Regions:
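Intrinsically disordered or compositionally simple regulatory linkers and C-terminal tails
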Residues: 1-3, 120-144
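Short, conserved, surface-exposed binding loops centered on an aromatic residue
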Residues: 10-13, 40-44
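Domain-level recognition of nuclease-like catalytic cores that cleave nucleotide substrates
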Residues: 20, 106-107, 121
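Solvent-exposed alpha-helical segments within well-ordered globular domains of core cellular machineries
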Residues: 32, 36, 40, 66-73, ...
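Short acidic-hydrophobic, aromatic-tinged amphipathic segments that line or gate anion-handling sites
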Residues: 103-114
Length: 144
């Protein structure tokens, strides 16, 4: 039996976020299982955020990054915000040199900073919702 086929990326819930602790080199099978596990947990837990902790990853190629990026997009379509944390300098250099898509990626130096960033995003989101609610009520009061 291929050990890689049963290897999984551990997922845990913390502060209404799914934290994926990626501490192994990535491969296609592992990324497929990760996507399935993550999206399933996202649906069942109703978490509103995902933090991908890459602190254990020493190298990532363009195809693996695209797969991770695709998983982040899927999670976003399910209503969760994604933050990448713990990318090592060599990994960051490789991603930039490979010219992979890193636009609109929210990132943090480490897991603690990612949790703080997620909390800040929640506050901003709540403030925006409150402002929109007030604007809607004011518009109704004006007869609009």
């Amino acid at each position: 039996m291929d050990v890689r086929a049963i290897q999984r990326i551990p997922l845990q819930l913390s502060q209404n976020c799914i934290v994926a602790s990626i501490q192994v080199d990535l491969n296609d099978d592992l990324l497929r299982l990760f996507r399935e596990d993550l999206l399933s947990l996202l649906q069942s837990s109703e978490a509103d955020g995902i933090i991908l902790d890459f602190s254990g990853v020493e190298i990532i190629d363009g195809e693996d990054w695209d797969a991770v990026r695709g998983t982040m997009t899927m999670a976003n379509l399910m209503g969760a915000r994604s933050i990448v944390a713990g990318l090592r300098p060599g990994v960051v250099s490789s991603l930039v040199e490979l010219e992979v898509d890193v636009e609109d990626i929210d990132a943090a130096l480490n897991l603690d900073e990612a949790l703080k960033l997620m909390a800040a995003f929640r506050v901003m989101s709540e403030e925006n919702e409150e402002a929109e609610s007030r604007d809607g009520e004011a518009a109704q009061g004006d007869g609009r």
